[in-house]
């Protein structure tokens, strides 16, 4: 399907329901799908979503609550250090999770290809939280966060915003929740989001390696 036709179909797709289903996850297709605002959610079958409205966060608009300041420098940050362990932790800390073995295998492949990335938080060399997602152009497509210690996922988002601020990124948060709103995320229309992707996904990120953003 041509890009213009897919764009038109997505504008008229269900606002709060899957756009289509697939039996499997394929790394190459995921990369293409993300550039059109699609993401997988649930498995067997895989459901693909492009919700309207869409929740995004602009890094320089991050809200840092006063009670968070004491946590910001409490944990050690590592980038792309143990992606596989982080995504597995995201699965294992949820009673019900769409992150099954196929998801982990496919996203780890995307990690080895340089698309998927992780920001991990450690305390005494123990992984206690983080966030992972895809970077395409100047968009960080957030997939999942995890927090073992208090406020670890919030710290991860704050640190991610700090790292991406100089590069004019947006962060796709997919679906609104109050936790994200408190941090500065907001909803925009699907049409506006898809137009942003047209521009941002075709730009250079501004850095060579995500893991080198901290030393």
From Swiss-Prot:
GO biological process annotation, one example: protein catabolic process
Keyword annotations from UniProtKB, A to Z: Acyltransferase, Cytoplasm, Transferase
Subcellular location, record wording: Cytoplasm
Primary residence: cytoplasm
InterPro entries with a match to the protein in the record: Acyl_CoA_acyltransferase (IPR016181), Leu/Phe-tRNA_Trfase (IPR004616), Leu/Phe-tRNA_Trfase_C (IPR042203), Leu/Phe-tRNA_Trfase_N (IPR042221)
UniProt-recorded Gene Ontology molecular function terms: leucyl-tRNA--protein transferase activity
Cytoplasm found in the keyword field: yes
Domain of life assignment: Bacteria
Stored Pfam families: Leu_Phe_trans
GO CC, one annotated term: cytoplasm
Disulfide pattern: none
Its EC number(s): 2.3.2.6
Catalytic activity: N-terminal L-lysyl-[protein] + L-leucyl-tRNA(Leu) = N-terminal L-leucyl-L-lysyl-[protein] + tRNA(Leu) + H(+); N-terminal L-arginyl-[protein] + L-leucyl-tRNA(Leu) = N-terminal L-leucyl-L-arginyl-[protein] + tRNA(Leu) + H(+); L-phenylalanyl-tRNA(Phe) + an N-terminal L-alpha-aminoacyl-[protein] = an N-terminal L-phenylalanyl-L-alpha-aminoacyl-[protein] + tRNA(Phe)
Protein family membership: Belongs to the L/F-transferase family.
UniProt function note: Functions in the N-end rule pathway of protein degradation where it conjugates Leu, Phe and, less efficiently, Met from aminoacyl-tRNAs to the N-termini of proteins containing an N-terminal arginine or lysine.
Family matches, as PANTHER family: LEUCYL/PHENYLALANYL-TRNA--PROTEIN TRANSFERASE (PTHR30098), LEUCYL_PHENYLALANYL-TRNA--PROTEIN TRANSFERASE (PTHR30098:SF2)
HAMAP family attached to this UniProt entry: Leu_Phe_trans
Record-given protein name: Leucyl/phenylalanyl-tRNA--protein transferase
């Amino acid at each position: 399907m041509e890009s213009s036709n897919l764009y038109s179909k997505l504008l008229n797709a269900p606002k709060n329901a899957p756009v289509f289903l697939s039996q499997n996850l394929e790394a190459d297709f995921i990369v293409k799908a993300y550039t059109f605002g699609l993401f997988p959610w649930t498995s067997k079958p895989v459901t693909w979503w492009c919700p309207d409205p869409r929740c995004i966060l602009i890094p320089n608009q991050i809200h840092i609550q006063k009670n968070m300041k004491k946590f910001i420098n409490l944990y050690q940050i590592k980038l792309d250090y143990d992606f596989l362990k982080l995504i597995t932790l995201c699965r294992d800390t949820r009673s019900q999770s769409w992150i099954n073995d196929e998801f982990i295998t496919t996203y780890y492949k995307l990690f080895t290809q340089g698309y998927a990335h992780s920001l991990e938080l450690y305390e005494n060399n123990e992984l206690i939280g983080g966030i992972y997602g895809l970077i395409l152009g100047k968009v960080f497509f957030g997939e999942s966060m995890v927090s073992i210690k208090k406020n670890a996922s919030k710290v991860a988002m704050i640190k991610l915003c700090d790292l991406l601020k100089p590069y004019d990124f947006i962060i796709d948060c997919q679906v609104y929740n109050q936790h994200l709103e408190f941090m500065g995320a907001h909803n925009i229309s699907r049409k506006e989001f898809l137009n942003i992707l047209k521009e941002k996904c075709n730009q250079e990120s501004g850095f060579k390696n995500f893991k080198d953003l901290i030393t």
